[in-house]
Amino acid sequence: MSNTDPQPPQKLPLNWVVWTLAVALMLYYLPAMRDRPEPAIKLPYSEFRMLLREGQISSVTLRGSELDGKFITPRMFPEQRRQYSRFLTQLPDFGNEAILAELEEQNIPLEVKEGHDASSSKVILLSYLPWIMFMIILFWLSRRTFRNFSGRGGAFDFDKRLETQFECQKPDTTFDEVAGQTNAKREVQELVEYLRDPDRFHRVGALAPRGVLLMGPPGTGKTLLARALAGEAGVNFYPMSASEFIEVFVGVGASRVRQLFKIAKENSPSIIFIDELDSVGRTRGAGYGGGHDEREQTLNQILAEMDGFAGHDAVIVLAATNRPDVLDPALMRPGRFDRHVTLDLPDQEGRVAILKVHARHIPLADDVNLNQVAAGTPGFSGADLKNLINEAAIQAARENRDHVHSLDFDIARDKIIMGAERTLIIPPDEKHRLAVHESGHTLVAYYLPNTDPLYKVSIVPHGRSLGGTHQLPLQERHTYPEEYLRDKLAVMLAGRIAERELLGSVSTGADDDIHQATGLARAMVSRWGMSKEVGPVDLRDSEEHPFLGREMAQPHHHSEFSAEIIDKAVRELLVAAETTAADLISTHREKLDRLVALLERSETLHKAQIDECLQTGAS
C-alpha cells in the first residue's frame, strides 16, 4: 500500500477552456460562413403571385410560412439599385393550397424545410453564442493582463520588482583602470578608507561625506570611477540611472528611492550610484508640472533619504552629471552632495595612460607610438580614446592584418573627427566651388598668427558634410584670448569670402559657418565683455544647453535697447572678420588659385602638402 497522499484532480486551466471553445466555435461557423446564401429581396405576396403567373420563378423552398424562391433570370430592382436572383415572401395563413397547385402546374421545383419556429431556441442560442464567447475571452485577457502587472514584475507590483531590480553588485574594477584622472582618484581615496574601516573614523567622531557628486563632460569616466571606488573598497554597489526612478504612475519614483536606500542600509557598507542625476535633480518649480509632478516627488524623496542617514550607516551616495548648473540647490548643501569631484578631459599625459589601458589586448605594430597618437588627439575624452583604439583595430581587421599599424590610427582619428567617408557623386562645378570654399578656410588659417595649426583639408564627403578644413591645437587650451577668437571668426567666414572673390557669388555651403561664427561673436559680446560698446556686462539670454523649465523661468537681463547694441556689436565683429579674411585672400590670390587647383585634383591635403603649396608654390 502506498504511503503517498492521493493527488487532487487537476483543474483544466482557464486558458485551455477558452481556446477550446474558440476553436469549436470557429469550426462550427466556418462552414456556415463559407455556404452563406446570396442576398435576397423581400417581395410582397401580390408581386410574387404576379411573377408566378408570368413564369419568372425557377424554384421555391418553403420554410413554415416563409417562401424562399429564385428567379429564372436576375431581376433589376431600381429601389435597391442592384439585381437579385433570390427573393423572400411571407405567405398568408389561408389560400396556400392554390399556390401549391399553381407551382405543381408550372413544374416549379418545391422543397419543404423545417420552419424557424420549430428551432427558435437553437437560433437564439447560436445568435448569442459569439457574444458570450467574446465576453469570456475579454474576461480572460483582463485577468491575465492584471496578473502580469501585479504578480510578475508589472507596474502594480513595485516591491517585488524592486527587490530584483536593485540587485547588489561586487565590481572588480580598480583605480588602475581609471587612467588619466589622477586628481579625481586622489579626492575619492579617503572614501575608500572610510568604507574599508568605518569604525576608525567613528571613534574620533568623523563622518564621511554622505553624497559625492562626480561632474565632468561626457565620456570622462564618471561611471568607471564610481565602480572603481566600490571595487577598491570591496563594498556592495547599487547602480541606478536617475531616469529609471520615473514611471508612468505617480509615486513610483519615490517608492523606488525608499526601497533602494532601504536595501543599501541593510547591506552596508555600500555605495549607491545614481547616474545622470540631472534627470530628476533639476531645479524645482520651473516647469509646467508645478511643485507636485513625479520628478519633483522623486527628488524630494532623495533629499529626505539622505537626511535620514544615521551616524553609523556606512552608505555613500555617488551621483554623476554633466550639467551641475541645473541641479537643485538643496542637493548641493552640506549633508547631501557636499563634495564635488570634477573629471576633466585628459591632458596629453593622461591620454597616453588611457591609450595604454585600452591597448593592453591589442596587437600593435612597431610603427605605433602612443605618445604621438596622444599628441594628435587633444580634446579627446576617455571614451573617445577607447573608441579610437577600437576603430583602429576594426580598420586593421578590415585590411586583413594581424597587427594595428600607425596608418590605422590615422584613419580612425579622421573618422572620429571628420565622420565616416561616404561615396557621393558631386558635379564638376559644385566640386570646384567646394574646393574654393575649403581653400579659403585653409589659406586664412595658414596666415593668421593666432589660429590652431592646420591638420587636413578635404573635399571628400565625410559624415554630414561635403568637405572640411580641420585644425588641431598643439596643446590643451583652458582660456581663449580675444585675438584668438577674432582670428577664429575670420577663418570661419573665409570660405564664403573666397567664393565671392573667385566665383563672384556665395552659396549655401556657408550656412554652418555663419551659424557658428554668429554664436561665437554673440558670446564674445554678451558673455566675455569683448566689445567696447557693451562693456564687461553679462547679458547672455540663456544657458548654453537649457532645458525647458529653466529656460521658461529665466528672465532676460537686458532691455530692447541693450539688445540692439548687442546685435550691432555682433555685426561689427563679423564684418571685421570678413574684412580680415578678404584682405588675406586678395593679398595671396595666386597662392589661393594654386591651392584650389591642387585640392580639386587631390581631394585631400595633409599639413605637409599644404605647407609645400603655400610656401614654395609647388603644384
From Swiss-Prot:
Bound cofactor: record note: Binds 1 zinc ion per subunit.
Keyword entries, A-Z: ATP-binding, Cell inner membrane, Cell membrane, Hydrolase, Membrane, Metal-binding, Metalloprotease, Nucleotide-binding, Protease, Transmembrane, Transmembrane helix, Zinc
GO terms for biological process, alphabetical: protein catabolic process; proteolysis
Entry GO CC: plasma membrane
UniProt main location, coarse: membrane
EC number: 3.4.24.-
Residue ranges, Cytoplasmic side: 1-11, 142-619
Periplasmic side, ranges: 33-120
Cross-referenced CDD domains: RecA-like_FtsH (cd19501)
Binding-site residues, Zn(2+): 437, 441, 513
PROSITE patterns, per the entry: AAA (PS00674)
Binding positions (ATP): 216-223
A GO MF label: ATP hydrolysis activity
Record field: transmembrane: 12-32, 121-141
Membrane topology: Multi-pass membrane protein
SMART domains: AAA (SM00382)
Broad class of enzyme this protein falls into: hydrolase
Gene3D superfamilies: 1.10.8.60, 3.30.720.210, P-loop containing nucleotide triphosphate hydrolases (3.40.50.300), Peptidase M41 (1.20.58.760)
Pfam family, one: AAA
Cofactors, names only: Zn(2+)
Active site: 438
Stated role: Acts as a processive, ATP-dependent zinc metallopeptidase for both cytoplasmic and membrane proteins. Plays a role in the quality control of integral membrane proteins.
Subunit-structure text: Homohexamer.
Stated name of the protein: ATP-dependent zinc metalloprotease FtsH
Lineage: Bacteria, Pseudomonadati, Pseudomonadota, Gammaproteobacteria, Oceanospirillales
Gene designation per UniProt: ftsH
